[in-house]
Amino acid sequence: MAQDQGMRGEKIYECDLALVSVTDYGVSMDDILTGKKAVPLQGARLDLHIDGACKGRLSGRQHGIDYLRMRADGRIDLDLHVIVETDDGHRIALSGDGQAAPRNGEPMIDIFANIRLTTASKEYAWVNERQIWSVGTGDLATGRIRVTAYMQ
């Protein structure tokens, strides 16, 4: 069982994801990040479309949407809806929630998510049984997201 010093559990994948597009609802992510506009009091909803490769016990491609909400108090809430397509042709639904913490003075966020994986595939039935915690970083300037997931 592979372990990370800061996280318990078995490491089941590492992902290198790209932010392929952003849908905004009245205020753009760029305007917020550059300081042109503040996050409105009611918050800002952004749909982040992601796609990329994952390696590990669960290897393949992940693509989907994070219905992200930037709050006026600085917190970022995550609402993940992703499809995992394994290298051997199976599909796994990934849903999750969590939060991201912006770093001061740089376009980076630290990501903390609570993940649920579900599938009817016999070969991957093991993903249905356990909780997954993931941690990572997002570089909002380059659109690169790196996440590592641990089965509890």
Enumerate the predicted regions with their spans.
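Beta-strand-enriched cores of mature, soluble protein domains
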Residues: 1-152
